[in-house]
A protein has these predicted regions:
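ABC-family P-loop ATPase nucleotide-binding domain
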Residues: 1-13, 313-323
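ABC transporter nucleotide-binding domains
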Residues: 4-7, 14-207
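Short amphipathic alpha-helical interaction patches enriched in hydrophobic/aromatic residues
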Residues: 85-88, 225, 229
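Short low-complexity, flexible loop/linker segments enriched in glycine and/or proline
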Residues: 205-206, 309-312
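Short acidic-hydrophobic catalytic motif
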Residues: 219-224
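Short, charged/small-residue-rich alpha-helical element at the C-terminal edge
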Residues: 226-310, 323
């Protein structure tokens, strides 16, 4: 594995007029890893990608992609990367095969048919090679777009929110394909607002409102989260949430389906006795206020818990921070 990163971003800032879309962003993407830029809409993910791809010039800082300066060496860079944008353009009146053929010609790929067959087999699209793109489902269109993006065998695959608007089954299938590509040695840089997808990345950068909050492996971020978290199943849920937020020993309350996650103020996860005592106190308090408590138990933090904590530590508003 080469020691030189495939992507190196150092102190990058990009503005749109008076609006700072990305501020002093620094991170590296290592060869052979799947790296995720994670954050809500407006976090600066797409702007950062466009600077990395050479579609925008930074106003400050430096960026190197595949060892090249993206803006100055854009033509050479385009031969070495694949970019699946949020609005990748397929030709609806062309078949699957014809779309792939078209993109192979754009990239000047010679003898591309064996590569096409390999990709169609990987994507389980061989039976549909004669179908018009307009007649494919949303998930199948996304697979075809991926095949077109990979036809020239890039060393870096960049994907901007590739599963937005895709049904859950197709979304899961698409990420399995990306994981397969990564295991085969391809370097991937992907943006997503979905924290469950971030779990599939080797490392992630959490972004919010143009600022980089942290860069690390998801497992490391979870291990470093210090304050204990209680998972609470109580009804009515709304009243339970309101009461928990009134308690001085509760630092934060987040909703996860039917359950609540209450972060305890000043109680470390490494102190199970204190966590157990706090759980008993919270359960008793909720019951005293007429709230039915089914269960209270300590749990490991989710990436959403960590993201919220990082946003709060940075002094930012947590509203609409995650999906």
């Amino acid at each position: 594995m080469s020691a030189e990163p495939v992507v190196a971003v150092q102190g990058m800032t990009r503005r749109y007029g008076d609006v700072v879309a990305a501020e002093d962003v620094t991170f590296e993407v290592r060869r052979g890893e799947m790296f995720g830029l994670i954050g809500p809409d407006g976090a600066g993910k797409t702007t950062t990608l466009r600077v990395i791809l050479g579609l925008l010039a930074p106003h400050a800082g430096t960026v190197r992609t595949c060892g090249l300066e993206p803006v100055r060496q854009g033509t050479e860079l385009s031969r070495r990367i694949g970019y699946l944008s949020q609005r990748f353009s397929l030709y609806g009146d062309l078949t699957v095969d014809e779309n792939i053929s078209f993109f192979a010609s754009i990239h000047g790929v010679k003898g591309w048919k064996p590569r096409r067959d390999e990709l169609l087999d990987l994507l389980r699209m061989t039976p549909f090679r004669g179908r018009l793109a307009d007649r494919l489902s949303g998930g199948m269109k996304q697979k075809l777009a991926l095949a077109c993006t990979l036809i020239h065998t890039p060393e870096l695959l960049v994907l901007d929110e590739p599963t937005t608007g895709v049904d859950p089954v197709s979304r899961r299938d698409f990420w399995k394909i990306l994981s397969h590509l990564q295991r085969d040695g391809l370097t991937l840089l992907v943006t997503t607002p979905y924290l469950d997808e971030a779990e599939r990345c080797q490392r992630i950068a959490l972004m919010d409102r143009g600022r980089l909050l942290t860069v690390d492996a998801p497992s490391h971020l979870k291990a470093e989260a210090g304050e204990a978290i209680l998972e609470i199943l109580a009804r009515p849920k709304r009243q339970a949430t309101e009461r928990l937020r009134e308690l001085p020993e509760v630092a934060d309350v987040q909703s996860f389906g039917e359950r609540l996650h209450a972060t305890l103020k000043g109680i470390d996860r490494a102190n199970p006795e204190a966590t157990k005592a706090a759980a008993s106190r919270l359960a008793a308090d909720l019951a005293a206020h007429g709230i039915e408590v089914e269960s209270v138990r300590p749990v490991l933090p989710t990436l959403e818990d960590i993201f919220i904590a990082r946003i709060e530590a940075a002094g930012l508003d947590t509203a609409a921070a995650v999906r």
